[in-house]
UniProtKB/Swiss-Prot annotation:
Organism taxonomic ancestry: Eukaryota, Viridiplantae, Streptophyta, Embryophyta, Tracheophyta
Membrane topology of the entry: Peripheral membrane protein
Family statement drawn from the similarity comment of this UniProt entry: Belongs to the Tic22 family.
Keywords: Chloroplast, Membrane, Plastid, Protein transport, Transit peptide, Transport
Range of the transit peptide: 1-50
Protein name per its UniProtKB record: Protein TIC 22, chloroplastic
Length: 252
């Protein structure tokens, strides 16, 4: 039984999310275990002694996508204890309304945050560079996209750990002798792009062209992969942004 004199904000917010999204059967504490279907089309034989992708390269692939967190009056991240209370982490929400809910939890439990705490956006490339510096974060995905991921993973619909990302080989772009593979945080955005490039992708068959994986797992694959392995081709498309517009900005 939880003590009435202590508050574990990670556990408290996890219960809040589960209360509103209990059908998704996922818990915030379980996102340490990275799972999900890998985007296997990018796995190739790795050359010996090849250089791995640099943090700047990985960060560039993440540019443009914003997440939301809570900061105090000094614009510092409001950190939470992990499930064991061993370390502090920052919570990053893919939906602003989830960050607002977290802010309400913080204000109700911590008097010092009632006046100056606020929700602030931060881009994923900035988050990644902070991670490189040793700051720990936990992502809270969009529950709609969790539902989409579970529907695509027909063989295992029990749970999905991490942030879902979606990809299709039909949308690979080749320009300036380079290959770019867009990865989406929104299944709906991917379906819209597929509807423009392939007649066969319309209607019921659209899911046949879509692969789903965990953002955290894909990110780890990028960090551990060498150049020319295929993982350096990935470009993450911000939710709601047009595929062509973002690719032009990245390629420029």
């Amino acid at each position: 039984m939880e003590s009435q004199g202590q508050w574990n904000p990670l556990l408290s917010f996890s219960r809040f999310i589960n209360h509103h999204s209990n059908h998704l059967a996922t818990r915030l504490e379980e996102t340490k275990r990275l799972a999900g279907t890998l985007i296997q089309s990018h796995t190739r034989t790795k050359p010996a002694f090849a250089a791995t992708l640099t943090p700047n390269h990985v960060a560039k692939s993440l540019a443009g996508t914003s997440v939301y967190t809570v900061s105090n009056s000094d614009n510092e991240f409001v950190l939470m204890s992990d499930a064991e209370g061993a370390k502090s982490i920052g919570l990053l929400c893919f939906r602003q309304e989830d960050a607002e809910a977290f802010l309400a939890q913080v204000r109700s439990r911590k008097k010092e945050f009632r006046g100056g705490a606020k929700v602030v956006p931060i881009t994923l490339d900035q988050v990644y560079m902070l991670k490189v510096e040793g700051i720990a974060f936990r992502f809270l995905p969009d529950p709609v996209q969790i539902k989409n991921a579970l529907e695509l993973r027909a063989a295992n619909r029990g749970s999905f750990d991490g942030v879902p990302v979606f990809q299709s080989d039909l949308l690979v772009v080749k320009k300036k002798n380079k290959r770019y593979c867009p990865v989406y945080f929104s299944k709906e955005d991917l379906e819209y792009e597929l509807s423009k490039v392939s007649r066969s992708s319309k209607g019921v068959g659209v899911s046949q062209h879509i692969m789903v994986g965990s953002f955290e797992d894909v990110l780890k694959k990028m960090e551990l992969s060498e150049k020319s392995s295929g993982w350096e081709d990935l470009v993450f498309i911000p939710p709601g942004k047009k595929h062509s517009q973002h690719m032009q900005e990245v390629i420029a």
